[in-house]
Amino acid sequence: MCQLSLIGLAFKLYDPDHLIGEREDIGITVALVPTDLPGVEIGRRHLPALQAFQNGPTRGRDVFIPVDNVIGGVAQVGQGWKMLMSALAAGRGISLPSLSAAGAAVAAHTTGAYARIREQFHQPIGRFPAIQERLGRMAATVYLLDAARRLTCAGIDHGHKPAVITAVMKEQATERLRVVVNDAMDVHGGKGVQDGPHNYLGTSYRSVPIGITVEGANIVTRSLIQFGQGAIRSHPYLLKEMTALEDPDRARRALVTLCATWAQKSRSNASSPRARSGSSSAVISLSR
């Protein structure tokens, strides 16, 4: 069995003795850790959902990691979050959405064929309205996933690293794949739950939770990245204010400038005809 030789490790870095600077709480940092370092232990591989997906425990106790092993050296300590988001953008924007689009297409193709040849009450089950509803939803989702995949990949291909868009794409693609596979299983009925070499849906059905969990679990991705980071990036001044706070020398002046600009923008929005019309409508609605 192939043994790992290098581990990419993200960790929260503290420097209480000020060995590399004045700050103690430096932040998330990424380092490359050789597996032959004393204290590193590589466990046996797991078998997630009975699939050939490489996964297993890695443990470390009293491991000494040289500062040269930090990606980017001392100059890049505390920059791990940006590194992780940039690295995850490829997996979230390319591999998992493409896998979801392909899996949904296969499920829709096989289910449509099955609904045509499987008969009940002397007619194909594809003529039943309930089956047609599921087939229609599956077909629409397949086209939707393929269009979204192409758009996201085009942005990445042009050099962009859209962290928020790729997070949205990963979450939406894997969740919609789950819906398509569930619809396919419903149409196949008992055929879909009988394990064997002729069951072409069972493996996909078991694999769906893996895509939902890896590269950032969807339940976390949706709340932390889509709403949290998305709101910060879309706001015209909030990200600049947060960045200014990281530099004590220019924080006060930058914050005053940004807050003044923010206040001016708010007054401009409040005095616009659309805002006044909305306020009047709200007052009339409340008075009623």
Stretches with model-predicted labels:
Residues 38-64:
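Flexible, small-/acidic-enriched active-site or ligand-binding loops
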Residues 1-42:
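A short core secondary-structure module
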Residues 63, 73-82, 190-205:
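Flexible glycine/proline-rich, aromatic-decorated loop/lid segments
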Residues 192-287:
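Glycine-rich phosphate/cofactor-binding loops in nucleotide/flavin-utilizing enzymes
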Residues 59-92, 109-126, 150, 268, ...:
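A glycine-rich, basic-preceded beta-loop-alpha segment at the flavin cofactor/substrate interface
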Residues 142-174, 178-181, 185-193:
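C-terminal helix-coil-helix/basic helical segment that borders enzyme active sites and/or dimer interfaces
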